[in-house]
Amino acid sequence: MNQVTQFSGNSANLMLYWILKSYYSRFDRIMWIDTLGTFNPAALPLPCLEKTMLVRSFDAQGLKDAVDELESNLKSSEDQAYALCIDSFSNPIGLLMAQGNISFAHAFMMTLGRKCRILTRKFRLAVYLSTSLVYIKQLHLSKPALGNSWPFCLDHSYILEDQQHNKCLVHCNQSRKDLLGCSQLFLLLKGSFTHEYLTIDFYNGTPVSVSSKLHVSPSLYHSSTLNSPS
């Protein structure tokens, strides 16, 4: 389970597009859950789009139904590798919380989060989702939305920090492996991210060594994002 927290607008979604463009060849099928109605097919290459099933889910129940459908697909094709991208996990959960029953919304969120994480352990599945950044006035700092319990569902959490001159710094603020504190600099060119030197392998969930830039293991599913995912 990988979370990307945006600094503004659709910055986290640009990160999800970049991840798919970089690693789509590792997956047989991709499900993109669009909770905002902003999916941009022009951001992905045609071979990636051909593998992608787009699901529009604007509320929490629709999000759950999409994950249930993915689980059914995984059970019927256990030999295939899947990627799940959720373009704004915090949006449907926030709408559910706004209805007033905070306890129910929190339980719903944690149940769905744990289910996604369990699926990454049982099947060849990598999960990438974006969330919003909220400002905590009392602490004078910003942090990912969804509260203090949600990080227990994650393997890696990244925060995007806006830099000057069309630069964006991706900082790992939570990791079950050895990514904590690692940063990746991206350049924003023509509405999409690119990089000069890759320091984080977002597929294996590991730092990229100088001598093995995105080395692919002979066994594809040795990856920590598949079967033992990040």
Curated annotation (Swiss-Prot):
Keywords: Cytoplasm, Nucleus. InterPro entries: HRR_RAD51_Paralog, P-loop_NTPase. The keyword Cytoplasm applies. One of its GO terms (cellular component) is nucleus. It is found in: Cytoplasm; Nucleus. One of its GO terms (biological process) is recombinational repair. Gene3D superfamilies: P-loop containing nucleotide triphosphate hydrolases. Its main location: cytoplasm. It comes from the Eukaryota. The keyword GTP-binding does not apply. Interacts with rlp1 and sws1. Involved in homologous recombination where it functions at an early stage of recombination in a pre-recombinogenic complex with rlp1 and sws1. Also has a role at a later stage of recombination in association with the rhp55-rhp57 complex. This is DNA repair protein rdl1. It comes from Schizosaccharomyces pombe (strain 972 / ATCC 24843) (Fission yeast). The gene is rdl1.
